[in-house]
UniProtKB/Swiss-Prot annotation:
Homodimer. This is Succinyl-diaminopimelate desuccinylase. Belongs to the peptidase M20A family. DapE subfamily. Pfam families: M20_dimer, Peptidase_M20. It comes from Rhizobium rhizogenes (strain K84 / ATCC BAA-868). GO terms for biological process: diaminopimelate biosynthetic process; L-arginine biosynthetic process; lysine biosynthetic process via diaminopimelate. It comes from the Bacteria.
């Protein structure tokens, strides 16, 4: 088979039911596209106690620098109610100019287009003056423990070094050419437990209601704002995601209350400085006796998620300029350079080389009837092909 057709590539990948953690044949299908192009393809299985084993793929064309890495994932989220789809989620049907299927935009479409772009570049110009690699995981939509982070470590231990990376996540809100991601906010999650004294609701003086205290502590995290934003990032934002007491009785004051929160933060902070700020706010609120006159300060515990992510911003001018000019050349749109949205595997790649993200329009990702315009697949392939040419030209300067 030839890999120059992004539509055929994507149909092949979608027909592999690779719902995390299942490989579903998707990495094998990708390998079949890359091997005829001259890539050396390797598979790596990552394991960790308490998590499913995950298959990953690393493929490289060339042995010299400069070295461009394309990164992404072939795993997809569950389809939900398959009967609600207008086309079977793994059939890759085309209707009304759109290709339907789970993973169409997130992100088998990006992989299909980059494979086609590389194939076209080789067909027209031969292999690039350097190296291109695919770093593809099967664990991005899941825990992300046995995926990109371990694949990077494995490859680096074998001597792999990269000069730049492009992640093919769907970055465009409305149309191709809208947005390139040049960084990501950091993320911290925490869990607060307030300890009270259980008692009868009619005799509050004999109890200590932790609900009042947990509300006060969470309010201290919400106001005042952590910052007003920076030149490249929107304001840091904390959301309380749950408050629980585990109490079904209306006449019982509970013994404890718990809350969870997540904060997406900008480059005003690091994980360490932000945790210190959160603790300072909680300590001040716990010591405030407004709601608990004459009592000891509120007793609380806090634990942190063991996998926070640091904020990062890519400042590699050659990488950003090569991609921006390629997008503008093909679409006529000047893309916005953005750091909005959630986290991605770029947070791991940033520790090895400069990284940017650009892919399809993300409006239907994770939804019933996930789909992509067939025309967008051709356009994205043209963007990627132009980017490859320009990046290697700029990297040689």
């Amino acid at each position: 088979m030839t890999a120059t057709d992004p539509v055929a590539n994507l149909q092949t990948l979608i027909r592999c039911a690779s719902v995390t953690p299942a490989e579903g044949g998707a990495l094998t299908a990708l390998a079949d596209m890359l091997l005829p192009l001259g890539f050396k393809v390797e598979r790596m299985t990552a394991s960790e106690a308490g998590t499913p084993d995950i298959e990953n793929l690393y493929a490289r064309l060339g042995t010299e620098g400069p070295h461009l890495m394309f990164a992404g994932h072939t795993d997809v989220v569950p389809v939900g109610d398959a009967a609600s789809w207008s086309h079977p989620p793994f059939a890759a049907d085309i209707a009304g100019g759109e290709l339907f299927g789970r993973g169409a935009v997130d992100m088998k479409g990006g992989i299909a287009c980059f494979a086609a772009a590389v194939a076209r570049h080789i067909e027209k110009h031969g292999p690039p003056a350097g190296s291109i690699s695919f770093l593809i995981t099967g664990d991005e939509e899941g825990p992300a423990i046995n995926g990109t982070v371990k694949l990077l470590q494995w490859a680096a231990e074998r001597g792999e070094q990269w000069d730049a990376s492009l992640v093919g996540e769907p970055t465009n809100p409305d149309q191709l050419g809208d947005m390139i991601k040049i960084g990501r906010r950091g993320s911290i999650s925490g869990f607060i437990t307030v300890h009270g004294v259980q008692g009868h609701a009619a005799y509050p003086h004999l109890a200590d209601n932790p609900v009042r205290s947990i509300v006060k502590l969470t309010e201290a995290l919400l106001d005042p704002p952590f910052d007003a934003g920076t030149d490249n990032f929107q304001p840091s934002n904390l959301e309380v995601t749950t408050i629980d007491v585990g109490n079904a009785a209306t006449n019982v004051i509970p013994a404890k209350a718990t809350a969870a929160f997540n904060i997406r933060f900008n480059d005003t902070w690091t994980v360490e400085t932000l945790r210190a700020e959160i603790l300072a706010r909680l300590d001040a609120a716990a010591a405030d006796q407004t709601l608990r006159p004459g009592r000891e300060p509120t007793k609380y515990d806090i634990t942190w998620s063991d996998r926070p992510s640091q904020v990062f911003l890519t400042r590699n001018n050659a990488l950003i300029a090569s991609l921006s000019s390629a997008v503008e050349n093909v679409t006529g749109h000047t893309p916005k350079l953005s750091t909005t949205g959630g986290t991605s595997d770029a947070r791991f790649i940033k520790d090895y080389c400069p990284v940017v993200e650009f892919g399809l329009v993300g409006q239907t990702m994770h939804m019933v009837d996930e789909r992509v315009a067939v025309a967008d697949l051709e356009t994205l392939t043209e963007i990627y092909e132009t980017f490859i040419q320009r990046w290697f030209a700029n990297a040689e300067l």
